[in-house]
């Protein structure tokens, strides 16, 4: 800070921080203070805060707004406060001229004490007071002018008489002076002439003597020098002449030899040049001919190569064709010969075998017929006896079987119930054990963390304790030195600053408003207009405090205690134990003001700043009791803690009232510890104060107040004493006399030097007691079931002997004819390449001879010059000696005259004048705007919006002092991204700096701006205002801000607080609509039921419902630039599982009204999207996995007006169909969406569904028993009746859609199988219906199906009725199986696959394969008539298809065998009862409905 201007007023409590600024300019809103009665400490803060998140799934910028910086918190807590003021100079030109004229006229002018006009806080008040001062100045000037004029007349008369006498005296004096002047001139003339002559003579004599000595010395030196030079010259001359002669002789010899050598070399070089020219001419001619020949040969070679390559390509193509044709013909012929030979060999062998078989068959047949007739009669008798015995055993078996099955079922039911009960109990125990594990783990983790912290704290404690012990020892050794405690102590109390404390005062205590208290005090006679100077001055002191609205304004009544409670303390502790509350009890004990019953007091919002009170230049004594409480609300005993009683002034009172003001602490119930060298002493009643003035050296003080009474002074201990607490309740009186205003701060900031803080030993954590897990219940014992009785085994009937049939004799086959040999093509003749011409030989360039260089000419020698002979300098002549002159005598001087006495002058009058002092406090205002310049205070704007803070100051008043500095400091809110370049551009006229550590921007007016402000100080001047530019970055954040203006380091003021909020803040008291921005995504079926997490069948449609969450934007005032970032909704759908249905997309508002102006675009990937879309998603930090849809507002501004700013959320219905092929693999698919507002992304939850894999199965059985043998891959006899078992795919429980279709489609091979028209359909598992009823597994569901048969193509389709399927609960699984009865009608191997359709999606089963061999004695089949189709609800008993045995009475009747031939008739589908169900079957299906399966039908 610069040194502030001092205007000559006392250092009051209000003005201490200004080092003597004008009375009343008080710093009221104080930040971090020490426990001085009236000082302020500057505090630095940083913006480094822990990063946390908002809890909202924001895709970009998810961090929550950090805690406000300390600087910002303190600044806003002191909003509106003022520190100091600017002096206003009212023109006193007329008064000054009158004073100057009076002084010039000789009037005695006395300047009286300046009149204090107080502080103007408004422009109107300022103007009024300036007018009053001008009027006062004019009145004074007029009175001074009158006195001056009268005095001037008296002076004129006196001057006339004086002038007359002075003239006479002057005439006599002039004559004397004239004579004296002539005398002095003559004396001076003579003296000058004599002195000149003497000086000239002495100078000439001195110069003569000097010149004579110099000449004599020079002549001697010259003679010696000449002799030396002459000797040297003669020696050098002889040496040079000899050297030059030798050099000349050597040079002439070398020139002669060089000339001879160069003549021989030049002749030889001329011959070499001629030979080289001839060789080059020959080489150039040969090279030219070579190049021509080479070009011709290369052209011929290129033409020959091209022609050969063309012929070669044609030859190779033709050769390849001929070779392939011949090879194909040869291979075909050789194969035909081989096959023909093999066939004929086989036919010949077979024909030979046929002959042998025919002969053998005839002989065997004749013998068998005879034996058959004898065996038949015996078999029939044995079979009748066996049947009667079997029926009796069967009845007994069935009775016993029923009993055993019931007993076992009862035992099983009891056991299963016990198992379920046991599972339930153990599940509960396991859940409880899991919680115990988690609690134990949490306890362990917490203990380990506390233990680690304890160990770290212990190490720090030991280190701190060692430093503390050393500091205490040092304090002991220096206790008698100035500034140290006379009894060394350590500090265990930390009670220094609590700016965020919550102050409460009982409602029974009246808290005054500013104007209300002002009126009350004025009623007491304390008024600016009171002619009693003491009371008018007291008012200015009172008004300086009362104008600050951060204090609680109270009136204390004598002996009536008032409690002021502070809670929510954050920074205070005693011996490491946190202090959460402090209670001050104030009681007025006595006052010398008025009737002694009341006094004003002001309680600070910070308990460490404490309070101001008044004494109105009388005396006041207030008792203060202080109690501290811990976090449990228990009263704390702070015995041993130290408190600071400082800035206890004496002798610095108002010069206008009484300078001997005194501040003291009295009746302290603790113990004082004096500071060595301090002015504060202990007195009776345990009081402490200074015995004499500690304000001025001239009055005995060690220092002036300004040298010790500041927070930064190293001597501030001079006015302090330390109190040691000895009781739970601290009590003392704060007392004053003639002080006006008194600020008393109670805290632990000790002014003494070297008071260490005693470290607190950490407490070791207690190891937790872990819970023991509970044992599980033992499983119930499995019951022992009775074995079912063994069913009787019927002795098989003896088969009737087969009647032999006369064999059909085979016919021999003819041989195959031999194949014809092929005719082969001749291969083409290959082309012959013409040989290339050889290239000519290239001539070789000759090797040229090199001419020999000439010998260089010898260098001519450089001859040395002969030396110049020395010349002797002639001797100088000696000078002539001067003669001394003769001097003139001096004349006699004239006599001086006696002057007449002057008259007595008139008495000088005395006039008095005074100036008036006026202070001004210019007002400031902070405005907050968006990029469009719209005021957004107390409103909402979107995250990432540009927010501008305008720092405005009202016009500077006329009469102001020269503005030397004009500084605005703005501690920015956290989460506000400051743009330095934009701020500088918007803040012309200021030098802008930014401190990143404290997140503070400072504007200093430039020299040019200050020059504008100072151009005419007599007129008001409008100020420039800087603008802070930046962006708000956080969701759900509140950005509050104010700034501080400091002018000339003499006046400071903190502005109002502005506020703006971003959406996404739940429970926002300022914006009731504000809450998390949480778009949602829900999957629904077509009925609108939520199907998130459910099983979704392939082919089903997901009706995704996307909520565009906009309600928290209601009242938003974002700028046009922010709006142009647009509004979008992104659906990142799984394209591998779903197909979008853009034709079904709908957008509606919350009331269901359709919304226009929103478009949707689908992109296969991020890479396929336009660059603009890629940039949009990147900025919003959205990464899509593949294909995605982008919904966008066509006109962002209209969309903003209609939906965003009104807080109207939208609902997008976005249907998507599950791909059919996804059901064949099954699996999970996920879907996630994002909302993008103003460029900010917000994610929905992930919606997860699963598509079940439908795996139908096909078996071949001979009964309806599911456990019967599967004949897949085995043999089925010709004409055997069997079943194709079609097991449908499993539809899991908790599926999303009702079943509309569940069918079995079997495209059987009609060449080998014949459908009998009989089928049965059963439930494969328990089914739960919508009405709560249950259909048990194994229930016959045939009546709930319909069947269709396509006899021509061999297709049977069994469908469940839709009304039955829709009765099944969505929570129930579903699976069914159908048995199709078939009859094998042909020999061979037959494959079959069927298709299970679920909601129109087809799924192929496995393929079954059965083989029918040629029977040894096949029966002749009887064709089965085709029945008419029947309603399955009205079953009809069909005729049993018969497979007759050979008849005895017709032994010669042959039965033809059909090998792989289709029957000419096929029965139509019908429904049969269970009589013939063991023989149901279904033909194999391959390749139905485009499934790509290979169906083989043999004709």
Curated annotation (Swiss-Prot):
Residues 50-84, 689-709, 763-907, 1409-1472 are annotated as: Disordered. The modification Pentaglycyl murein peptidoglycan amidated threonine is found at residue 1469. Its main location: secreted. Induction: In the absence of the sspA gene, collagen does not induce sspB (at protein level). Keywords: Cell wall, Dental caries, Peptidoglycan-anchor, Repeat, Secreted, Signal, Virulence. GO terms for cellular component: cell surface; extracellular region. Residues 1-37 form the signal peptide. Disruption phenotype: Single sspA deletion, bacteria invade human dental roots less well, adhere less well to collagen, decreased accumulation of mature SspB; double sspA-sspB deletion, no invasion of dental roots, collagen adherence is further reduced, as is chaining on soluble collagen. Triple sspA-sspB-hsa deletion no longer causes human platelet aggregation; double sspA-sspB deletion still causes platelet aggregation. Double sspA-sspB adheres better to human epithelial cells and is internalized better than wild-type cells, but induces less host cytokine production (IL-6, IL-8, monocyte chemotactic protein). Residues 1470-1499 form a propeptide. InterPro entries: Adh_isopep-form_adh_dom, AgI/II_N, Antigen_C, Cross-wall-target_lipo_motif, Glucan-bd_C/Surface_Ag-I/II_V, LPXTG_anchor, SA_I/II_PAC_V_sf, Surface_Ag_I_II_A_rpt. Coiled coil: none annotated. It is found in: Secreted, Cell wall; Cell surface. It comes from the Bacteria. Residues 694-705, 800-815, 839-854, 1428-1450 have a biased composition (Basic and acidic residues). It is a peptidoglycan-anchor. Ag I/II A repeats lie at residues 145-219, 220-301, 302-383, 384-465. Belongs to the antigen I/II family. Adhesin that mediates binding of bacteria to a variety of host cells. Plays a role in the bacterial invasion of dentinal tubules. A host immunostimulatory component, it modulates the innate immunity response. Plays a protective role against some antibiotics and cationic antimicrobial peptides (histatin-5, HTN3, but not beta-defensin 4A, DEFB4A). S.gordonii, a commensal oral cavity bacteria, is among the bacteria most frequently identified as being the primary etiological agents of subacute infective endocarditis (found in 13% of cases). This is Streptococcal surface protein B.
């Amino acid at each position: 800070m610069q040194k502030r201007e001092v205007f000559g007023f006392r250092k009051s409590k209000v003005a201490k921080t200004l080092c003597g600024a004008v009375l009343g300019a008080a710093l009221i809103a104080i930040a971090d203070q020490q426990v001085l009665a009236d000082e302020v400490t500057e505090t630095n803060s940083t913006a480094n805060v822990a990063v946390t998140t908002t809890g909202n799934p924001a895709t970009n910028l998810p961090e929550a707004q950090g805690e406000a910086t300390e600087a910002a918190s303190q600044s806003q807590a002191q909003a509106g406060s003022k520190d100091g003021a600017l002096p206003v100079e009212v023109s006193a030109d007329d008064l000054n001229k009158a004073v100057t004229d009076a002084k010039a006229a000789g009037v005695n002018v006395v300047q009286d004490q300046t009149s204090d006009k107080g502080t103007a806080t408004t422009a109107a008040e300022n103007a009024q007071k300036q007018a009053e001062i001008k009027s006062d100045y004019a009145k004074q000037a007029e009175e001074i002018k009158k006195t001056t004029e009268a005095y001037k007349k008296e002076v004129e008369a006196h001057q006339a008489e004086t002038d007359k006498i002075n003239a006479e005296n002057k005439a006599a004096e002039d004559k004397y002076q004239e004579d004296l002047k002539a005398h002095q001139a003559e004396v001076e003339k003579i003296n000058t002439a004599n002195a000149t002559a003497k000086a000239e003579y002495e100078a000439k004599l001195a110069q003569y003597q000097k010149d004579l000595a110099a000449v004599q010395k020079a002549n001697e030196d010259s003679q010696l020098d000449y002799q030396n030079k002459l000797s040297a010259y003669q020696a050098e001359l002889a040496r040079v002449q000899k050297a030059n002669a030798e050099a000349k002789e050597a040079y002439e010899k070398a020139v002669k030899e060089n000339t001879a050598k160069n003549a021989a070399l030049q002749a030889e070089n001329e011959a070499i040049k001629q030979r080289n020219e001839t060789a080059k001419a020959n080489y150039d001619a040969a090279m030219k001919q070579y190049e021509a020949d080479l070009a011709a040969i290369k052209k011929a070679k290129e033409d020959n190569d091209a022609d050969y390559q063309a012929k070669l390509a044609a030859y190779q193509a033709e050769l390849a064709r001929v070779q392939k044709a011949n090879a194909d013909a040869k291979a075909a012929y050789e194969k035909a010969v081989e096959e023909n030979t093999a066939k004929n060999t086989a036919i010949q062998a077979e024909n030979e075998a046929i002959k042998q078989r025919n002969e053998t068959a005839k002989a065997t047949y004749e013998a068998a017929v005879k034996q058959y007739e004898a065996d038949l009669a015996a078999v029939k008798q044995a079979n009748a006896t066996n049947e009667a015995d079997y029926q009796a055993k069967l009845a007994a078996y069935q009775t016993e079987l029923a009993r055993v099955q019931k007993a076992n079922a009862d035992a099983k039911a009891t056991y299963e119930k016990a198992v379920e009960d046991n599972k339930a109990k153990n599940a509960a125990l396991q859940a409880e054990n899991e919680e115990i594990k988690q609690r134990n783990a949490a306890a362990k983790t917490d203990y380990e963390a506390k233990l680690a912290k304890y160990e770290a704290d212990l190490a720090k404690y030991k280190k701190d304790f060692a430093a503390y012990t050393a500091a205490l020892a040092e304090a002991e050794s220096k206790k008698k030195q100035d500034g140290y405690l006379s009894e060394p102590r350590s500090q265990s109390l930390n009670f220094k600053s609590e700016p965020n404390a919550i102050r409460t005062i009982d409602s029974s205590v009246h808290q005054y408003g500013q104007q209300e208290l002002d009126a009350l005090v004025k009623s007491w006679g304390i008024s600016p207009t009171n002619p009693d100077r003491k009371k008018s001055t007291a008012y200015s002191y009172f008004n300086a405090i009362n104008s600050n609205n951060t204090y609680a304004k109270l009136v204390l009544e004598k002996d009536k205690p008032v409690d002021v409670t502070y809670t929510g303390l954050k920074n205070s502790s005693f011996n490491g134990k946190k202090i959460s509350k402090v209670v001050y009890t104030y009681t007025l004990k006595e006052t010398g003001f008025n009737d002694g019953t009341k006094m004003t007091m002001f309680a600070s919002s910070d308990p460490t700043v404490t309070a101001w009170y008044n004494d109105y230049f009388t005396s006041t004594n207030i008792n203060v009791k202080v109690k501290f409480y811990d976090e449990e609300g228990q009263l704390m005993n702070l015995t041993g803690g130290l408190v600071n009683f400082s800035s206890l002034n004496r002798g610095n009172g108002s010069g206008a009232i009484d300078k001997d003001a005194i501040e003291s602490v009295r009746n302290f119930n603790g113990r004082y510890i004096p500071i060595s060298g301090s002015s504060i002493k202990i007195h009776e009643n345990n009081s402490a104060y200074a015995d004499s003035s500690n304000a001025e050296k001239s009055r005995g003080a060690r220092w002036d107040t300004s040298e010790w009474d500041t927070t930064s002074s190293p001597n501030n201990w001079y006015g302090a004493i330390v109190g040691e607490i000895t009781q739970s309740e601290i009590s003392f009186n704060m007392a004053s006399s003639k002080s006006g205003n008194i600020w008393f701060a109670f805290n632990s900031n000790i002014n003494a030097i070297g008071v260490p803080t005693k470290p607190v030993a950490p407490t070791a954590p207690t190891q937790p007691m872990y819970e023991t897990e509970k044992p599980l219940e033992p499983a119930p014992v499995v019951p022992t079931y009775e074995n079912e009785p063994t069913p009787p085994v019927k002795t098989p009937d003896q088969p009737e002997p087969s009647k032999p049939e006369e064999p059909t004799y085979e016919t021999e086959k003819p041989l195959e004819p031999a194949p014809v040999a092929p005719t082969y093509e001749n291969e083409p003749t290959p082309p012959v390449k013409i040989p290339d011409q050889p290239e000519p030989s290239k001539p070789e360039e000759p090797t040229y001879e090199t001419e020999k260089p000439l010998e260089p000419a010898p260098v001519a020698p450089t001859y040395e010059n002969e030396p110049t002979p020395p010349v002797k300098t002639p001797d100088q002549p000696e000078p002539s000696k001067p003669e001394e002159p003769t001097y003139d005598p001096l004349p006699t001087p004239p006599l001086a005259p006696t002057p007449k006495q002057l008259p007595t002058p008139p008495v000088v009058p005395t006039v008095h004048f005074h100036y008036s002092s006026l202070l001004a406090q210019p007002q400031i205002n902070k405005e907050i705007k968006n990029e469009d310049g719209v005021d957004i205070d107390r409103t909402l704007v979107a995250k990432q919006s540009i927010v501008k803070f305008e720092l405005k100051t009202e016009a500077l008043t006329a009469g102001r002092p020269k503005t030397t500095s004009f500084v605005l400091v703005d501690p920015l809110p956290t989460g506000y991204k400051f743009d330095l370049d934009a701020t500088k551009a918007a803040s012309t006229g200021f030098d802008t700096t930014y401190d990143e550590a404290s997140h503070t921007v400072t504007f200093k007016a430039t020299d040019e701006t200050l020059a504008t402000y100072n151009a005419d100080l007599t007129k008001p001047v409008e100020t420039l205002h800087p603008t802070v530019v930046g962006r708000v970055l956080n969701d759900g954040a509140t950005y509050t801000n104010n700034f501080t203006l400091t002018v000339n380091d003499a006046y400071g003021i903190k502005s109002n607080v502005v506020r703006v909020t971003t959406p996404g803040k739940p429970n926002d008291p300022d914006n009731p609509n504000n809450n998390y921005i949480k778009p949602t995504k829900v999957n629904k079926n077509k009925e609108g039921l939520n199907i998130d997490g459910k099983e979704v069948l392939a082919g089903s449609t997901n009706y995704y419902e996307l909520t565009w969450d906009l309600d928290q934007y209601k009242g938003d005032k974002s700028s046009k630039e922010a709006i142009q970032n647009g509004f979008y909704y992104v659906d990142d759908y799984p394209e591998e599982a779903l197909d979008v249905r853009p034709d079904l997309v709908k957008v509606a508002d919350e009331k269901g009204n359709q919304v226009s102006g929103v478009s949707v675009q689908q992109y296969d990937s991020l890479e396929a999207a336009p660059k603009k879309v890629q940039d949009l998603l990147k900025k919003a930090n959205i990464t899509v996995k593949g294909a995605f849809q982008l919904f966008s507002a066509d006109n962002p501004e209209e969309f903003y007006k209609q939906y965003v700013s009104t807080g109207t959320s939208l609902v997008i219905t976005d249907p998507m169909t599950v791909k059919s092929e996804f059901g064949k693999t099954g699996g999970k698919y996920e879907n996630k969406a994002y909302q993008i507002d103003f460029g900010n992304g917000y994610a929905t939850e992930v919606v997860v569904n699963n598509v079940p894999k439908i795996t139908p199965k096909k078996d071949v059985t001979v009964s309806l028993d599911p456990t019967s043998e599967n004949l897949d891959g085995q043999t089925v006899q010709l004409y055997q009746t069997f079943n194709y078992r079609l097991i449908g795919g499993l539809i899991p429980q908790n599926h999303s859609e009702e079943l509309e279709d569940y069918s079995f489609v079997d495209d059987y091979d009609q060449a080998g199988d014949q459908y009998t028209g009989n089928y049965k359909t059963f439930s494969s598992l328990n089914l739960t219906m919508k009405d709560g009823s249950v259909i048990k597994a194994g229930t016959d569901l045939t009546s709930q199906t319909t069947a269709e048969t396509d006899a021509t193509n061999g297709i049977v389709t069994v469908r469940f009725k839709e009304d039955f399927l829709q009765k099944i609960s969505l929570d129930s699984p579903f699976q069914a199986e159908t048995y199709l009865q078939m009859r094998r009608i042909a020999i061979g191997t037959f494959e079959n696959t069927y298709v299970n359709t679920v909601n129109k999606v087809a799924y192929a089963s496995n393929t079954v394969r059965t083989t029918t061999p040629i029977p040894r004695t096949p029966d002749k089949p009887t064709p089965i008539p085709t029945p008419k189709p029947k309603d399955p609800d009205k079953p009809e008993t069909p005729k049993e298809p018969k497979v007759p045995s050979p008849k005895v009475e017709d032994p010669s009747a042959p039965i033809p065998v059909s090998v792989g031939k289709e029957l000419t008739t096929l029965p139509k589908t019908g429904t049969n009862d269970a009589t013939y169900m063991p023989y149901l079957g279904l033909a194999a299906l391959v390749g139905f409905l485009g499934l790509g399966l290979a169906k083989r039908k043999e004709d």
